[in-house]
């Protein structure tokens, strides 16, 4: 029998609010109060700095970022600096890796495989880069991965550019890599794609890669479970 797991499509959600939700789910998953849970979310404009993050990778001044209404958040995930914003599909799995039989490397590869599968559904050939994690199309990067794992339970995850305004990546050296060009599904196709199309594809490949009894849940349902 497949183990139960939850899938939540949260739509647009403030970065810090989603981070708090991840931490609460993580704490409950560690003690087996909740099953594996995956959050699908989109964020307002936000820049995050991972454990290797350095503000020298910011090309805009703190004053300019404040004027633009873009917060800079130091977080516990791996990796360097990245941008989140409208038109980006972000996947946050809170999974017990040991129970899943996954090493850290296996898990990151699975996240990359998920995105490569999604891109394939849109006729785009994604690939890994032997030197840098994430997913690439040709020489351009389309998805960034940065995870945190504590007591064998994951949080944070992977962000895929769908209809993202790529100009915002000009505010940073993406993932700490100078000269990296970012791309998106809409840029490669020459047309916009709907968020619902992307989310359906993500859900399909999530089920393909992580065999669970995936059950869709709403935020109020999860909040009730966490507060029980």
Swiss-Prot record:
Annotated keywords: Acyltransferase, Cytoplasm, Transferase
Catalysis performed (reactions): octanoyl-[ACP] + L-lysyl-[protein] = N(6)-octanoyl-L-lysyl-[protein] + holo-[ACP] + H(+)
Top-level taxon of origin: Bacteria
Residues of the BPL/LPL catalytic domain: 32-214
Site (Lowers pKa of active site Cys): 141
Involved pathway(s): Protein modification; protein lipoylation via endogenous pathway; protein N(6)-(lipoyl)lysine from octanoyl-[acyl-carrier-protein]: step 1/2
EC nos: 2.3.1.181
Active-site residues, record numbering mapped to chain: 175
Other notes: In the reaction, the free carboxyl group of octanoic acid is attached via an amide linkage to the epsilon-amino group of a specific lysine residue of lipoyl domains of lipoate-dependent enzymes.
Family of this protein: Belongs to the LipB family.
HAMAP family per UniProt: LipB
Job of this protein: Catalyzes the transfer of endogenously produced octanoic acid from octanoyl-acyl-carrier-protein onto the lipoyl domains of lipoate-dependent enzymes. Lipoyl-ACP can also act as a substrate although octanoyl-ACP is likely to be the physiological substrate.
Protein name: Octanoyltransferase
